[in-house]
Swiss-Prot record:
This is DNA helicase MCM8. Keywords: ATP-binding, Cell cycle, Chromosome, DNA damage, DNA repair, DNA replication, DNA-binding, Helicase, Hydrolase, Nucleotide-binding, Nucleus, Phosphoprotein. The keyword Nucleotide-binding applies. Gene3D superfamilies: 2.20.28.10, Nucleic acid-binding proteins, P-loop containing nucleotide triphosphate hydrolases. InterPro entries: AAA+_ATPase, MCM, MCM8/REC_WHD, MCM_dom, MCM_lid, MCM_OB, NA-bd_OB-fold, P-loop_NTPase. GO terms for cellular component: chromosome; MCM8-MCM9 complex; nucleus. Belongs to the MCM family. It comes from Mus musculus (Mouse). The modification Phosphoserine is found at residue 623.
């Protein structure tokens, strides 16, 4: 009756799939019962003494004398009681026996691997007593140490299954008259949380064969291919079949036949033989983190290739932040190089042992299933500092003035950038039945040159836990999104991540936004759907790009013309402008008090004085006289005044390194929701805006403005590490939104004009021209005269209350558009009758 349980565990569904092949390999012949292997040996006329002299062969009659049933799966050496690995195997066996109940055996069956926490391993008494130098053993001899670890868990699982099978037989009253045979396949030991992390610049030739851990961004992922680790060869002379190992997947032929009497030297590979074993294989390229403090300016970021096998394949996509732990190995730089000297050149790569995905769609199912590999790690000192920052009385003022202290003024613009750094909460991200709603706000800064837009942009990217800074005039469309490249060696297509994918779950700063040309169209999908779709060369895929875009642009002509809309000043489409939550207009208007304080600030900065961080006493005087608009209604103490530093007040800005930790902690652990009062305040403001925009026959206010208000309000609560956004948060956001809208809706006279689309669709004075031409048509039909003098046209415009900055240019534009025809000096003929 033993055959009923052989190779199937104990018959309750656990480890049932271990008899069939997985991962592209063929385990069906390799994991057959041991007596079948003996029959195969006898059929081929093989002797036991000859087998003992061939330690590399998989078939061996010495299995019955080895206490570890999986010895041949992990070691090529012949088993000996004096082996130096026995003590390590026993120590690991004690460790896994004590922790076996903490592991999910079904998960081990599905993956063929087990996760081992390095920190728990070094703290275990059974390990430190028998292997006191476990850190050095794993670092200097990783292959043998991991083999000991794998054999130990193999032995523990084998004993556990045999015990359960025996208990099951006893319960059912069965007796097999002998020992229950259970065959467990190769189990990989995956070590994670390995310390210390090694920077890519420190990986040199001295690291060859060492066990290291690196962290970086995945920039390239290859296709999954089968890798042969054991090939069956048949002797051409006697027909004997042997399984020959192929270390590192390098194809080599056997040197001699295992039959002593045979002298055959010619062998044919048998790829379909049960003794041929293949694994899934994938190659990824890791780039050092852009936000890493160790990076050096002025050089290309370092990259290194990593090989993933078996269950590690398909554990990451381009743009993911991963922690790869593995063994440093070398490969030939150029296989087919014409120069013979290049045969001595090698390239370092990492044979991955574990991959912990910090983010991305694979983060939940990565090797570190319990989310150990988070985006940022916080020490106890960091947590104390974060708690002290949170305890500040006016936290928003402190954070805003710490963002970019060298730039004077622009408090509300800095507040908008700060809110973009913290971001809102993404909705329905894990619900496959709903469309996700983005939580990352986008900010656009438009203004005259020399007002510090680029410096504020660089400061925001520097403070962000994950920030990518690019310049629009040197960036291509594929450099922003994703590139499909072809591998020269294999001919396969591979994806290479661009700036938006590398900035996933972070900030992407784009300077010189107006000089990007046709690259604007590549941002449309990334800014709203927060993904990038690619359809090229038969490859159709989608990559995540959950990033906040902060852009800075200069107007056409070098100076912002308020007579034009934002679209006309930037030569940019309305589809792109409508995706920005906040659009700030920075104007260089002369102001004696402001200029005096600004000059003092610049001189103090150049002198290196500490008090130069005072951003303080700018008083912005708005020139709106009417109080009919909701945009002009201000509270008793507006946010812009609360953010300013009073004269003589000493400020202690937060260092960028600590502020980066604070922002990372808030984004990682705080997920605020709107309170009822906050939602009511936002709804009232939105409905009032809709009412005023409909009153003038235009509708520039859409639901995107309401979603922007919600996102920014959540970011305002997240800044103070609160789980609920209050009405005060909503009022602060409403004031920032008012400041943004005042710049986009104000005309050249400082009046609010809702007929000017916020997103700049169409000419700014188109409705004025239509109204003027309509009046001329009425007069011409009434007087039967379509000839007008220049002074008559000016009088008609005055009666219609049409205000333009330059009436002569206004008439000239109507002449260019074909509405009026110039018949002589100061004489025009109407052409629309």
């Amino acid at each position: 009756m033993s055959g009923a349980y052989r190779g199937r565990g104990f018959g309750r569904g656990r480890f049932q799939s271990w008899k069939r092949g997985r991962g592209g390999g063929n385990f069906s012949g390799r994991w057959r019962e041991r007596e079948n292997r003996v029959d195969l040996n006898e059929a081929s006329g093989k002797h036991a003494s000859a087998q003992a002299s061939q330690p590399l062969l998989q078939q061996s009659t010495l299995d019955q004398f080895i206490p570890y049933k999986g010895w041949k799966l992990y070691f090529s050496e012949v088993y000996s009681n004096n082996s130096p690995f026995i003590e390590k195997i026993q120590a690991f066996e004690k460790f896994f026996t004590r922790h076996i109940d903490l592991y999910d055996k079904d998960e081990i069956e599905r993956k063929g691997s087990i996760l081992v926490d390095f920190k728990e391993l070094t703290k275990a008494d059974e390990i430190t007593n028998l292997i006191p130098d476990i850190e050095n053993a794993l670092r200097d001899a990783p292959e043998k140490t991991l083999a000991c670890m794998g054999l130990a868990i193999h032995q523990v699982l084998t004993k556990d299954l045999e015990r359960h099978a025996a208990e099951l037989q006893a319960q059912e009253g069965l007796s097999n008259g002998g020992e229950t045979m259970v065959n467990v396949p190769h189990i990989y030991a995956r070590v994670y949380n390995y310390e210390p992390l090694t920077h890519l610049k420190n990986i040199r030739a001295t690291c060859y064969g060492k066990y290291i851990s690196i962290r970086g961004t995945v920039v390239r992922v290859s296709n999954i291919k089968p890798l042969c680790t054991n090939m069956a060869f048949q002797c051409a002379a006697c027909g004997e079949i042997q399984s020959f190992p192929l270390p590192d997947g390098k194809y080599t032929l056997p040197t001699k036949c295992p039959v002593p009497a045979c002298r055959g030297r010619s062998f044919a590979p048998l790829r379909s033989s049960p003794l041929t074993v293949t694994l899934d294989w994938q190659l990824i390229k890791i780039q050092e983190l852009m936000s890493d403090a160790q990076r050096e300016a002025g050089r290309i970021p370092r990259t290194i290739e990593c090989e993933l096998v078996h269950d590690l394949v398909d554990s990451c996509v381009p743009g993911d932040t991963v922690t790869v732990t593995g063994i440093v190995k070398v490969s030939n730089s150029e296989e087919g190089s014409r120069n013979k000297n290049d045969k001595c050149m090698f390239l370092l790569y990492i044979e991955a042992n574990s991959v912990s995905n910090s983010k991305g769609p694979k983060a939940q199912t990565a090797e570190d299933g319990c989310k150990h590999g988070t985006l940022m790690e916080f020490s106890l000192k960091d947590l104390y500092a974060i708690r002290e920052i949170q305890a500040e009385e006016n936290l928003l003022k402190l954070v805003v003035n710490s963002l970019c202290p060298v730039i004077f003024g622009h408090e509300l613009v800095k507040a908008g950038l700060t809110l973009a750094l913290f971001g809102g909460s993404q909705k329905y991200a894990d619900d496959k039945n709903r469309i996700p709603i983005r939580g990352d706000p986008h900010v656009l800064i438009v203004g005259d040159p020399g007002l510090g837009k680029s410096q504020m942009l660089q400061a925001a990217c520097n403070v962000a836990p994950r920030g990518v800074y690019v310049c629009g005039n040197t960036t291509t469309s594929s450099g922003l999104t994703v590139t499909l490249s072809k591998d020269s060696s294999s001919g396969d297509f591979a994806l290479e991540a661009g700036a938006l994918v590398l900035g996933d779950q972070g900030i992407c700063g784009i300077d010189e936004f107006d000089k990007m040309g046709n690259q604007h169209q590549a941002l449309l999908e990334a800014m709203e759907q927060q993904s990038i779709s690619l359809a090229k060369a038969g490859v159709v895929c989608s990559l995540p790009a959950r990033t906040s875009i902060i852009a800075a642009a200069n107007p056409v002509g070098g100076h912002y013309n308020k007579a034009r809309t934002v679209s006309e000043n930037l030569k940019m489409g309305s589809a792109l402008l409508s995706r920005f939550d906040l659009v700030f207009i920075l104007l260089d208007t002369p102001n004696e008090q402001h200029d005096h304080l600004l000059s003092e600030h610049v001189i103090a900065i150049r002198a290196g004085k500490q008090k130069a961080v005072s951003s303080a006493t700018v008083t912005r005087v708005l020139s709106q006289d009417s109080n009919t608009s909701v945009l002009e209604v201000v509270s008793e103490k507006p946010l812009s005044e609360r953010l300013k530093v009073a004269p003589g007040e000493q400020t202690d800005p937060i260092p960028h390194q600590l502020l980066r930790k604070y922002i990372g902690y808030a984004r990682q652990y705080v997920h605020p929701r709107l309170s009822t009062d906050a939602a009511q305040a936002l709804q009232d403001f939105y409905l009032e805006l809709r009412k005023q925009s409909q009153r003038v026959g235009s509708s520039p206010i859409t639901t995107r403005q309401l979603e922007s208000l919600i996102r920014l309000t959540e970011a305002r609560a997240r800044l103070e590490l609160r789980e609920e956004a209050t009405r005060e948060d909503a009022e602060d956001i409403i004031e920032i939104m008012k400041h943004s809208m005042l710049g986009t809706y104000s005309d050249e006279f400082g009046n609010l004009d809702f007929e000017r689309s916020q997103h700049g669709s169409g000419m700014s004075n188109r409705s004025t021209a239509k109204r003027f031409i309509s009046a001329l048509n009425s007069i011409a039909e009434r007087t039967y005269n379509n000839i007008f003098q220049y002074h008559q046209l000016r009088q008609i415009a005055k009666e219609l209350n049409i205000q333009v900055a330059d009436f002569e240019n206004f008439i000239g534009s109507l002449n260019d558009q074909g509405y009026l025809l110039k018949k002589g000096p100061k004489i025009y003929q109407l052409q629309t009758m």
